[in-house]
Each structure stands twice: as structure tokens, then as C-alpha cells.
Amino acid sequence: MILFMFPVFFTFSQGPLTEIKKPEVFKQMFSEATRKTQTIEADFIQEKNLSILSEKIITKGRFMFKKEKKLRWEYTDPFHYLIILNNGMMFIQDEEKKHKIDIRNNKMFAEINYIIMGCVQGNLFNDEKKFLSSFFENSGSFVVKLKPLASNLKEYLSEIWICFDKNDLSVTRLEMHEPSGDCTNIDFSGTKINATIPDEKFLVP
């Protein structure tokens, strides 16, 4: 798998990327959009590329987010798998198996929660102690490239790419690259911002 070490050649459907000359302007725009965003929901298609397999693993599902720190990530095809994050607690349901984890007492899951929430809200690039950030754009997207600086993150992530729609700054694509060469790409569609989502969707049993 080719890691995107040369961003000027990296392309999306809207054309090649160019580096943003004033990233502070983008950060300000994004901060304002985030402040106004109370909920997000979208469909997603996840594509897992494993170096040991010739075929890609494709899964589909539904994603929901609600301030503060509430997230529901539900795979519906070809299997059912549910993850709920709610104020320091993580609930996982794998078919009939159920697990509940107090993230605050588990360093590994705390990091997972940090990355998931940071990717969804797009604010990982503000953490200069943990990530080196680069900013790019084309006609339809802003793209933030993140390289982990913390040793514990480098163990399982080499790069993260977060793509934002220029119209509403919602996340449209997320790419997570691993040191092994494996890669997970997630494309979001049908995104609704500030639609009503009942709290029951985020209950941890």
C-alpha cells in the first residue's frame, strides 16, 4: 500500500490538492462550525485494505454523534456490530455478545475514544503534542493530514487523513494508515447536521 507521503500528488474527485497557505484561517472557520454543531448523523461505507488479503473488506452502517461526547457507530451490513461511546463509557455489542468498558480506567480504550471523537469532531489537528498537522485543499474539500508524534500512537497509526466538505465542513472521508501498510477508509454520505437525535440512541445498558 502506498502511503500518501507526497500530498501535492494526492487527488480526490475534485482535483489535486494544494497546501493551504494560511491554516489558521481554516482552523478559525472550523472552530466556528464546530461550535454551532450539536448533532451529526450519516451513513458510512468502510473499506479495509489488509496487506495479507487481495480483496478489500467492505462494511456499511450508520453513524451518530451528539454533544457532549456521545457517539453511536453501528455496522449493519454484512453483520451487526454496535459501538456506543457516552461520557467515559464504551458499550460494544457483537451479535449476541455484549461488553461494557469504563474508558477512564483503561488507557488503550481511552486513546481509542480520543482518536474516534477527535476524528469525528475534526479537532485532532489542534493537539500539537500528539500530532503533526498539514493542511490542503482542492475545489470541493479541505484535507488535514495528521502524523502521530506520541510513541503509543505510532505503534498502530502512521497517518490519518480527514477530509471536510467545503460547504458545511462536515467530515466526508476518513483514512487511517497503519505502520504495517494496512489501511482503513471510511466514506460518509447523507450527512445531516443538527437533526434531532434522541438520547436513547446513546444509552449504555
Predicted regions span which residues?
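N-terminal leader/targeting segments and the immediate start of mature chains
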Residues: 12-55, 200-205
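Short hydrophobic/aromatic-rich beta-strand segments that constitute the beta-sheet cores
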Residues: 44, 71-75, 90-93, 144-146, ...
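Short, surface-exposed charged micro-motifs
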Residues: 60-62, 72, 80-82, 132-134, ...
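Hydrophobic h-region of N-terminal signal peptides that target proteins for export
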Residues: 3-13
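An acidic-aromatic
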Residues: 62-114, 184
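Anionic-ligand binding region
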Residues: 115-124
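One face of beta-strands
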Residues: 38-46, 59-63, 69-73
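Gly/Pro-enriched, hydrophobic low-complexity segments
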Residues: 101, 124-205
